[in-house]
Regions:
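The substrate-binding groove and active-site-proximal loops of carbohydrate-active enzymes
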Residues: 23-35, 56-73, 120-139, 164-169, ...
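Polysaccharide-binding and catalytic clefts of secreted carbohydrate-active enzymes
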Residues: 115-282, 286-300
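Short, well-ordered coil/turn segments that N-cap beta-strands
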Residues: 20-22, 49-51, 83-89, 151-156, ...
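Carbohydrate-binding surfaces of carbohydrate-active enzymes
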Residues: 210-213, 244, 252, 285-678
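Aromatic-lined substrate-binding rim segments of carbohydrate-active enzymes
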Residues: 40-47, 51-119, 146, 245-253, ...
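Short, acidic/polar
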Residues: 32-47, 138-144, 265-276, 336-344
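Conserved, mostly hydrophobic/aromatic
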Residues: 26, 45, 53, 82, ...
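N-terminal carbohydrate-binding accessory modules
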Residues: 1-54, 65, 80-84, 88, ...
Length: 678
């Protein structure tokens, strides 16, 4: 195996995270098991090839069983055992959930929900991010852990808390209200500026002094949307501040890199990870298939591409996933044979250089006892365990891909701020959601075999042939000008409805929709005209659409397709215009998936985009990782039939030579070191 190229620069004196090849890891919770099980654990880890273990994630009550008491006996022994067996440690700070004695002595640290009720201990994350009492106790524990293990040879990485903000991101107590007011003072300076930003002349909400402002708890009616989005921003910043406080403590005692596990997965939207990503020494993400979605497998690819975007195109760590079923969905589906491997390598294809799981050994008790694990309740004579061992061997075969990355010609813009604002309480229709529109856009490109980067509205767009902007409801003047400049200089863009509508304060841009993008697109919309969820309209192209139409007028743009029925027959539904040396498209409705794919094919071809893989229903994924000297083609076949892909080189999974055509069996993954680097 070859030592990994440094994947991300450590900050504030930290070293870079390096590893021999692709890390294969897990959450390891030995405190749940008798000590005689630990020796078997490390033997099995070595058999499977597991070489990175996250420990002490929920260790707080073990390290501090009572006030003033510390017990590091178990953690000492586990660290030494792992190190002796060549297993590196991703060491948790132990602060993710407070011990019962702390919430008993200080119930004021407990989070308060938007209805004003206190959330009790007994689950996890029973703390408010703004609680000064919790911070004092948590940082004191971090100090002890960092001082004791800051130079332990097993520690490869620090793991701050766990899934920050998963349950407690939005807290509505008095400590939070005070911190929110401080954040608002820093943002606006004067109460007059805040009133202007929040539009408080509406509904007699004008504030006279800072003390009058609280958290946006539930009201008798809908809440002020400008206050709500600022509270989302504040809450993300407040948890980021907490993360920084833990990092400051760790830096005093250790130069090991520091991270925390993001949750770029399905519906979770509590934190703005564009602001978080620069703060971690390497981006790490937890991802779980969510079967409440129409297409969980395509969402996995989207999440992996978004995580790579957060990492700035550099390598990142898949910190958690499952071998099979989870425990927290209404219907927790097991994975089919081979699916765990396909999921894992889909992440690797999109830039991951660690494949880790929750958890090592399935728990006997607790809320997650039916969550799958590397070692299931039934033990090692199981299909799951055999696939785990095979996956470890496969990752070893792929070690040489480390240091390469993914290059895409197409970017899709994504914004947590726009998500928060677009899905507010008061919007034209609740049948349309931001994430659905983003996922649909991505799926259409994915099914065309087109590789995609997910980027922020502030990203450098100069390297892309096509930029797609799905439902970017909230956009700043600078971001709008940034996209217009990209098109002016020869880029191609596709903007979809409900984009550019408001500024950063959720203030509607006057003069007609789509506000910030009106001039770029050569159109104006005088009125939204949403449809009932069971209604459809037909376009003169033959396409079917639903959920949304607009009273649109072209102002220089060409009408590519018009409605032939519905509330606005004859009105343009798709437009195209030249802008500078580039082209800007606009989609004013929700096309059915096949029609959206057809539109994306037309737009991408016009932009000069060449698909890497074949068109499919998402069952075949083709992704290339490369650098200046090497090129690797990943082909992931989720389908029930064998597929053939043009390729030549050395196939790494099976160790065979590919002359001109790669055959990938149903349900399999193949990775070819291509003969000719790009």
């Amino acid at each position: 195996m070859t030592a990994r190229t440094a994947v991300q620069q450590g900050s504030h004196g930290a070293t870079r995270f390096t590893h021999e090849g692709i890390a294969f890891g897990c959450d390891y919770n030995p405190e749940q098991w008798a000590s005689e099980v630990w020796q078997e654990d490390v033997q099995l880890m070595r058999k499977a090839g597991v070489d990175l273990a996250a420990i002490n994630i929920f260790g707080g009550s073990h390290l501090e069983p009572q006030p003033g008491q510390s017990d590091f006996t178990t953690l000492d022994a586990v660290l030494d055992l792992l190190h002796a067996n060549g297993i590196r440690v991703n060491l948790g700070t132990g602060t993710s959930s407070p011990p019962p004695w702390l919430t008993t002595l200080h119930p004021e640290i407990l989070p308060v929900a938007q209805d004003g009720t206190t959330r009790n201990p007994g689950g996890r994350q029973a703390w408010c991010p703004s609680s000064p009492v919790f911070r004092v106790h948590a940082l004191a524990l971090v100090e002890k852990v960092a001082e004791r293990y800051g130079h332990h040879p097993a520690v490869a990485l620090w793991h701050v808390s766990n899934e920050l903000g998963c349950h407690n991101a939005l807290c509505y107590d008095e400590d939070t209200a005070a911190a929110f007011r401080g954040w608002l003072r820093a943002r606006y300076g004067t109460i007059e500026a805040l009133n202007a930003a929040w539009g408080t002349s509406f509904w007699s909400q004008q504030y006279g002094q800072w003390a009058e402002i609280g958290t946006p708890m539930l009201t008798l009616s809908t809440r002020n949307p400008s206050q709500v989005i600022d509270f989302h921003r504040f809450s993300s910043d407040e948890l980021l501040d907490y993360y920084r406080r833990e990092v400051e403590v760790l830096r005093r005692h250790s130069t090991a890199p520091v991270t925390t596990n993001f949750m770029v997965t399905a519906h979770i939207r509590n934190l703005d990870y564009w602001t978080w990503a620069p703060e971690v020494d390497i981006v790490a993400n937890d991802h779980y298939l969510d079967h409440r979605l129409a297409d969980p497998t395509t969402e996995l690819s989207f999440a992996a591409d978004l995580t790579r975007g957060l990492a700035g195109g550099n390598a990142w760590l898949l910190m958690e996933q499952s071998t099979g079923a989870v425990n927290w969905q209404p219907y927790n589906l097991a994975k089919a044979p081979g699916q765990m491997t396909r999921n894992s390598l889909a992440h690797v294809a999109r830039g991951a250089e660690a494949v880790c799981f929750f958890q090592w050994r399935a728990s006997q008790q607790g809320s997650e006892k039916f969550h799958s694990a590397l070692v299931p309740h039934a033990g090692t004579d199981t299909e799951v365990w055999r696939e785990v061992v095979d996956l470890g061997a496969t990752l070893d075969h792929l070690d040489e891909i480390v240091g390469t990355t993914v290059v895409a010609d197409v970017a899709v813009m994504f914004s947590w701020e726009s998500w928060w604002a677009a899905d507010g309480e008061s919007r034209p229709t609740h049948a349309v959601s931001y994430l659905d529109r983003v996922h649909a856009t991505y799926a259409a490109l994915h099914e065309l075999g087109i590789t995609v980067d997910i980027v922020s509205p502030d990203a450098d767009l100069s390297g892309y042939r096509l930029v797609v902007v799905p439902g970017l409801y909230l956009v700043s003047d600078a971001q709008a000008a940034h996209l217009a400049d990209y098109v002016e200089r020869g880029g191609h863009a596709l903007v979809t409805f409900f984009s550019g509508i408001v500024d950063e304060d959720d203030r509607v841009r006057l003069g007609g929709y789509p506000g910030a993008f009106r001039d770029l697109l050569g159109i104006t919309v005088e009125e939204f005209s949403p449809l009932q969820p069971d209604h459809t309209v037909t376009l003169d192209s033959g396409a079917t659409a639903s959920l949304w139409t607009e009273r649109l007028h072209t102002c220089g743009a060409e009408a590519v397709a018009r409605y032939v029925d519905g509330p606005l027959p004859g009105t343009a539904a798709i437009t195209r215009t030249s802008h500078g040396t580039g082209v800007a498209w606009y989609l004013a409705t929700v096309l059915e998936p096949g029609a959206l794919r057809d539109l994306m094919r037309t737009v991408s071809r016009g932009a000069g985009v060449t698909p890497l893989g074949p068109e499919s229903d998402g069952t075949v994924e083709v992704v290339r990782r490369a650098d200046a000297d090497r090129s690797y083609l990943f082909v992931i076949n989720h389908g029930s039939c064998d597929v053939s892909i043009p390729a030549a080189g050395h196939e790494l999974v099976c160790g065979t030579t590919v002359e001109s055509t790669l055959c990938v069996p149903a349900g399999a993954v193949r990775v070819v070191r291509e003969d000719t680097a790009p």
